[in-house]
Amino acid sequence: MPASTRTASIERRTGETSIELTLNIDGSGMVDSATGIGFLDHMLHLFARHGLFDLKVHASGDLHVDEHHTAEDVCICLGQAFDRALGERRGLVRTAHAYVPMDEALGFVAVDLSGRPYCVVDADFVTPRVGQLGTDLIAHLFESIAIHGRMNLHARVLYGRNDHHKVEALFKALGRALDMATRIDERLGGAIPSTKGVL
């Protein structure tokens, strides 16, 4: 698939949220995120900048209830955008990983754009919230990206003290791992990177 076509626009409207998201995999890290959840916007900004993705997200939701529905649906849309933008996934490097330090915290993410969704998150947090985002949601957000992006995603905080730093390390590592996994390997000549011939 030519790099110029690796974009996607997703709209999701439910009784709980209204979301518009646009992704350009082959971007330069331009970000416009307005979800109503400041810490989530911060993480999406870091994710896209470290992955060099162009990302635009405008979301409104039932934040008078809590942040769960809005944060979850944004990550559902993000996963769907990657799946749509990658098409048949021809020529992809496909698998990649990244370690990212954030001060005293170290995060690790490995991804396989296999078409088979699975997610493992190994991270312990000591505070219930970082900003407006519950730390109990972090694993669920990564799961939403993995399931709807049809990718195998493993994320781990190896160590750290500050929960903000831990989450930041994970989102940066996810951006960098996906940047590498979505690159085109010219040696494949546009072939699907699987012995099955399909992803």
From Swiss-Prot:
GO terms for biological process: L-histidine biosynthetic process. CDD domains: IGPD. Its EC number is 4.2.1.19. Gene3D superfamilies: Imidazole glycerol phosphate dehydratase, domain 1. It is an enzyme of class 4 (lyase). Keywords: Amino-acid biosynthesis, Cytoplasm, Histidine biosynthesis, Lyase. GO terms for molecular function: imidazoleglycerol-phosphate dehydratase activity. PROSITE patterns: IGP_DEHYDRATASE_1, IGP_DEHYDRATASE_2. Disulfide bonds: none annotated. Pathway: Amino-acid biosynthesis; L-histidine biosynthesis; L-histidine from 5-phospho-alpha-D-ribose 1-diphosphate: step 6/9. It comes from the Bacteria. It is found in: Cytoplasm. It catalyses: D-erythro-1-(imidazol-4-yl)glycerol 3-phosphate = 3-(imidazol-4-yl)-2-oxopropyl phosphate + H2O. Its main location: cytoplasm. GO terms for cellular component: cytoplasm. Belongs to the imidazoleglycerol-phosphate dehydratase family. This is Imidazoleglycerol-phosphate dehydratase. The gene is hisB.
